[in-house]
Every structure is written in structure tokens, then in C-alpha cells.
Design a protein with these regions (language model features):
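Helix-loop boundary and gating motifs at the non-cytosolic
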Residues: 2-55
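Helix-loop junctions at membrane interfaces in 12-TM secondary transporters
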Residues: 4-7, 88-101
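Hydrophobic core of transmembrane alpha-helices in multi-pass small-molecule transporters
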Residues: 18, 83, 94-111
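Transmembrane alpha-helix termini and helix-breaking/packing motifs in multi-pass membrane transporters
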Residues: 29, 34, 147-168
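Residue-level signature of mid-helix packing/kink "hotspots" within the transmembrane helices
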Residues: 50-58, 144-148, 152
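C-terminal ends and interior cores of transmembrane alpha-helices
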Residues: 74, 78-92
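Cytoplasmic helix-loop-helix junction between adjacent transmembrane helices
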Residues: 102-143
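Helix-loop junctions on the cytosolic side of multi-pass membrane transporters
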Residues: 169-189
Length: 189
């Protein structure tokens, strides 16, 4: 039976970064274009994503301070799943895609810094605080590599199958939820 521990959290954070930020939906611009969005609409949707992310960064940080790390990580994955569902069922409707982009920005905001804080607190609780930079560098490298790998894999779906990338992202988000469940919440923040 799996026993929750701070040492296990270190590997679990790395695995959640791998699946959570796989980059499989990297071709979202092409996805929107294939679903009838004009370049102007795509530009507005991207602007909406970045504006939402900018305006939500501080409030999501307040929530991170108010609730547990795991709660924020769960919320991030829930937002990711909902965002993917809106993108899948948007069927060319601008406002549905717009709401999906807002949810996607919130998914990033809820994770922003939370996984790093979880990693730091876990390393500290495990008595490995002096190795935090090594762990953090490794997790960052995993995240960057998986974004690239995800984009390469997504390339196989560009000819009319980009919907599948959102299905895969939902599946990966469910895996991350399982990984979060296996994490031990740090005793204090």
C-alpha cells in the first residue's frame, strides 16, 4: 500500500508536472481556425486568456494562502478539464470558446507557484531543503521537456483530429488528480 510522505511528494510533483503540462493542446490556434474562428476572433480569445491570467494572478495567490496546496492543485486541474470540455463542445461558438479560455487561464493561475511551493515545503519537511534547487530544476526541466514532447505528439493530430488533443488533456488531468490525492499536505504553510 502506498504511504503518503514528503519524500514521495517530490516525485509526485514531478509526475504531475509531466501530465499536467504535457503541451498536447499546443495547436489551439489551429484548432480554433479549424472550428471556424477568424484570425481576429482568435486574437481576441488569446487576449482574453492573457488578460484573465493577469487579473487573476493575485486573487489566485490569495486563495493559495487561504486554502491548502492540494486544494489549489485540484482546482487547477478541474479548471483544465472544464476548459477542455468547453473547447470540445464549442462547435464554432465564440462565447463558448471565450469561457473555455477564461477557465484555461484560471487553470494556469491555480497551479502558478503552488506546485513549486508544495515542492519546497515537502523538501523542507523531508529534511532535504538543501536539495530544493536541484529538485526544482529537475521539475522545471520535466515541465519544459513535456511541453515540447506534447507539441510533437499533437502534430500527429493536426489533420482534422485536434479534438483528440483535448480528450487526451482531460485524461492526463484525471491522472494528475490521482497524483494530487497521493500527496501529503505539508503540516504548515
Amino acid at each position: 500500500m502506498f504511504k503518503k510522505s514528503y519524500r514521495h511528494n517530490i516525485a509526485l510533483v514531478g509526475a504531475s508536472e509531466f501530465f499536467g503540462f504535457f503541451g498536447i493542446t499546443s495547436f489551439w490556434l489551429l484548432f480554433l481556425s479549424q472550428h471556424g474562428m477568424s484570425f481576429g476572433q482568435i486574437g481576441i480569445l488569446e487576449s482574453l486568456f492573457h488578460l484573465t491570467s493577469l487579473l487573476s494572478e493575485v486573487p489566485s495567490g490569495v486563495l493559495a494562502d487561504r486554502f491548502t496546496y492540494r486544494t489549489n492543485l485540484y482546482l487547477g486541474r478541474l479548471m483544465s478539464i472544464l476548459s477542455c470540455l468547453f473547447m470540445l463542445f464549442g462547435q464554432g461558438h465564440f462565447w463558448i470558446y471565450a469561457f473555455g479560455m477564461v477557465l484555461n487561464a484560471w487553470a494556469y493561475n491555480f497551479d502558478s507557484g503552488t506546485s513549486t511551493a508544495m515542492l519546497f515545503e515537502s523538501a523542507k519537511e523531508a529534511g532535504l531543503e538543501d536539495k530544493f534547487l536541484k529538485f526544482s530544476s529537475f521539475v522545471s526541466a520535466v515541465a519544459e521537456a513535456t511541453r515540447t514532447l506534447g507539441a510533437v505528439v499533437a502534430g500527429f493530430f493536426v489533420h482534422g483530429l485536434l479534438d483528440m488533443t483535448y480528450v487526451i488533456q482531460i485524461f492526463f488531468s484525471l491522472i494528475v488528480i490521482i497524483l494530487i490525492t497521493m500527496m501529503k499536505e505539508p503540516a504548515f504553510k
